[in-house]
């Protein structure tokens, strides 16, 4: 029985994966490639593996993709169909995914699960659940691989929030005021003065004559009236100040693990600090 161990975008990636399988003990006869691409001559000559051309799953007159996979993954050495679909080493719900991959021109790498090797292989992009995800292959490829390094950066946004308000009102207080005001009043004085004896117009003597003198004084009359003495002006202005924040962020750092003899690398080519 055969099982898919990886899906690849380019023939170069496929070659690298196949070479990795060969180094793990697989024979080229144990490895197959399924694709809808036509530019596979170099792949076949480089690896010696069989490349099977997948049919277009959307052609009604052709054998369906489902049946094609069924026939391909269940045929034995005599090319007889001896297995049922339920015995495939592939999940039924993955059929549509494989169909989309082939329609997109990708290459499916399959191995014979009965091959005598140390352990099954998965390049990390396998869709089948029959193989582990250990990435132990030492792939030989001239292509450069990139791994993005990410870090968290702080992003600070500002929004206006109401922290308080000021309300201005008035209240009446009573206080005592003291004032000194000058006032006038009449005071009585009585004097006896001598007169000229030669005056002859004196009235007859009797005891009924009286004189009256009014006595006047100023009295205070207190009235109150409101007057404006001050005014209160309320406004606001914007001031700017620095506010300190502190937060923990994560950052990815590259880590190089070497196993065995690796030539061409310095002690720390990644300059880890």
UniProtKB/Swiss-Prot annotation:
Q: Where is the signal peptide?
A: none
Which Pfam families does this one have?
DUF2382, YflT
Chain positions covered by the region annotation Disordered: 241-273
Q: Where is the composition biased (Basic and acidic residues)?
A: 241-264
Q: Does the keyword Transferase apply?
A: no
- Induction of expression: By phosphate starvation, via the alternative sigma factor sigma-B.
Key words, A-Z: Stress response
* Annotated protein name in UniProt: Stress response protein YsnF
Q: Which organism is it from?
A: Bacillus subtilis (strain 168)
Q: What is the lineage of its organism?
A: Bacteria, Bacillati, Bacillota, Bacilli, Bacillales
- Whichever gene encodes this chain, its name is ysnF
């Amino acid at each position: 029985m055969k099982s898919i161990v990886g899906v690849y975008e380019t023939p170069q990636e496929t070659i690298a994966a196949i070479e990795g399988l060969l180094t793990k003990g697989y024979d080229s006869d144990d490895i197959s490639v399924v694709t809808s691409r036509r530019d596979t001559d170099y792949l076949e000559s480089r690896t010696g593996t069989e490349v099977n051309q997948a049919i277009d799953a959307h052609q009604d007159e052709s054998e369906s993709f489902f049946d094609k996979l069924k026939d391909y993954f269940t045929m034995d050495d005599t090319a007889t169909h001896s297995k049922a679909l339920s015995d495939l080493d592939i999940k039924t719900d993955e059929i549509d995914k494989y169909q989309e991959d082939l329609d997109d021109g990708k290459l499916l790498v399959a191995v014979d699960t009965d091959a005598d090797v140390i352990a099954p292989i998965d390049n990390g992009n396998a869709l089948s659940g029959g193989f582990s995800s250990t990435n132990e292959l030492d792939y030989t490829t001239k292509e450069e691989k990139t791994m993005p390094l990410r870090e968290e950066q702080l992003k600070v946004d500002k929004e206006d929030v109401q922290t308080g308000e000021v309300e201005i009102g008035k209240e009446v207080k009573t206080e005592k005021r003291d004032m000194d005001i000058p006032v006038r009043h009449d005071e009585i004085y009585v004097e006896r003065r001598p007169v000229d004896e030669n005056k002859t117009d004196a009235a007859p003597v009797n005891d009924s004559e009286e004189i009256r003198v009014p006595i006047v004084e100023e009295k205070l009359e207190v009235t109150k009236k409101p007057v404006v003495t001050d005014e209160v002006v309320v406004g606001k202005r914007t001031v700017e100040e620095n506010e300190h924040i502190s937060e923990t962020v994560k950052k990815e750092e590259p880590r190089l693990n070497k196993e065995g003899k690796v030539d061409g690398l310095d002690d720390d080519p990644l300059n880890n600090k």
